[in-house]
Amino acid sequence: MSNDDAVLLDLNVPTFQKKLFELDAGEVKKVFKTFQKLQMLTWNEVFRDHGLKWEQVKNEPGTFTIRLSKSYRAVVERDSAFMLFQTLHLDHDGAYGKK
């Protein structure tokens, strides 16, 4: 595993899929544009990208949040080259378990 590896997306967690499929068409378009962007990046590029806002979740090692659109953040984990999408949140605080 290297930070120079291309990012691979794993969108197969049922709780993530449920929220993703509930999005309206406009929001789906924005989120999928971010998925397309992520597939073109290496891990180092993800860490440096200011628009994605990759952040560690406090007190949860190995768990991070990433901005998918202006409205939505996802909670993700990294497994080798894979970014595993766990949950999707409308609000910033929800992604950090604060609500």
Where are these regions (language model features)?
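Enriched for short, Lys/Arg-rich terminal
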Residues: M1-D10, P14-E22, P61-K99
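N-terminal first-folded block
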Residues: F16-L38, T42-V46
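Residue-level detector of alpha-helical recognition elements and their boundaries
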Residues: V31, F35, V46, H50-K53, ...
